[in-house]
Amino acid sequence: MISIIDLVNYLKNEKVGGVIYPLSFPVNSPDACSTVNFVSGTPTRGGVGKVYLQVMTRDVHPAKAEKASNDIRSFLEKRTDFLLSDMQVILVECQNFAPFYLGMDENNRHLFTLNYTFTMGE
């Protein structure tokens, strides 16, 4: 089975997206960073299932946060045939036309998000 940690480690190993955390932003994390979280998934049918993920980025300037979000998208979009742990990723598709602006957090950092569908094979 795939885990958030698998994807976070994959992005870190590929040097994509800068500082990335699983699930949420830690209290002492830098202003410029991202999180990865599961949104939902589908049952496996014929050895294929889908996992829906959200990648949220933040930074003190909106252009920097949006760029980080787009950098991750450029790396993941239409990526095919790679392994996360022992699971094959058949295809990654971004579900948004552009990064969606969520507003500012309690420390005035700008937040953007993109949602992805990972088609997975057993």
Positions of the model-derived regions?
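Oligomerization/assembly interface segments of phage tail-like spikes and tubes
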Residues: 48-65, 110-120
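Acidic-leaning, charged glycine-interspersed low-complexity segments
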Residues: 78-122
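A generic structural signal for ordered secondary structure
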Residues: 10-14, 51, 59, 75-79, ...
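Short, conserved turn/kink motifs that form compact alpha/beta structural patches or helix kinks used as
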Residues: 42, 58-68, 95
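Short amphipathic alpha-helices in soluble, non-transmembrane regions
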Residues: 68-74
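Short, solvent-exposed beta-strand/turn "edge" segments of beta-rich domains on protein surfaces
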Residues: 44-47, 105-107
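Small/polar-rich, solvent-exposed N-terminal microdomains that initiate assembly or binding
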Residues: 1-45, 67, 79-91
